[in-house]
Amino acid sequence: MASRDQVKASHILIKHQGSRRKASWKDPEGKIILTTTREAAVEQLKSIREDIVSGKANFEEVATRVSDCSSAKRGGDLGSFGRGQMQKPFEEATYALKVGDISDIVDTDSGVHIIKRTA
């Protein structure tokens, strides 16, 4: 359970050639990531977000299938965190969301994300 100054969130991360780490659980050698442009990653996430918001897809199921973060095995669940624990753009986007809302595309050194605030 998140304390008053903490939030709880899940996310879907798509890494691209500009990401600080070029490997993920589903692409251990980074072969796909190295050939994915930021623009392609953003377009993929926009399409995913549309499907989730329209009800065609479930956030957690999509996160499990496509997220480049190891949190994919938990449906993208990052658990609770407070200010200063995540990269600034990620933190600001998460704190700006209401519980249940899904962010627009958020850029960090890790890649591009959509975030769902869960508490």
Curated annotation (Swiss-Prot):
GO terms for cellular component: cytosol; endoplasmic reticulum; mitochondrion; plasmodesma. One of its GO terms (molecular function) is peptidyl-prolyl cis-trans isomerase activity. InterPro entries: PPIase_dom_sf, PPIase_Pin1, PPIase_PpiC, PPIase_PpiC_CS. Pfam families: Rotamase. Its EC number is 5.2.1.8. One of its GO terms (biological process) is regulation of flower development. The modification Phosphoserine is found at residue 103. Coiled coil: none annotated. Keywords: Isomerase, Phosphoprotein, Rotamase. It comes from the Eukaryota. This is Peptidyl-prolyl cis-trans isomerase Pin1. It comes from Arabidopsis thaliana.
